[in-house]
């Protein structure tokens, strides 16, 4: 899956499933990405086995997606 497709998948979940967990392990542009979040709080974010930790109560969807993009650039 491409980076754009992956971010679209996350945006869709944020819009349509605000009170549900998102838990996935995907291949994004050749990188293994593990992500678990609820609302705008990231429980787990890993890229190729490197753990980027958790972040709580990220204020906006734009900032939330920016954190994920920053990890994808690793």
Walk through the language-model features, giving the residues of each:
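Negatively charged, low-complexity tracts enriched in Asp/Glu with abundant Ser/Thr
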Residues: 2-26
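Intrinsically disordered, low-complexity N-terminal regions enriched in serine/proline/glycine
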Residues: 5, 12, 36-37, 51, ...
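Functionally constrained cores in energy, signaling, and assembly domains
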Residues: 18, 32, 74
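Residue-level detector of alpha-helical secondary structure
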Residues: 7, 11-15, 62-65, 69-72
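Acidic, low-complexity, intrinsically disordered interaction modules
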Residues: 21-65
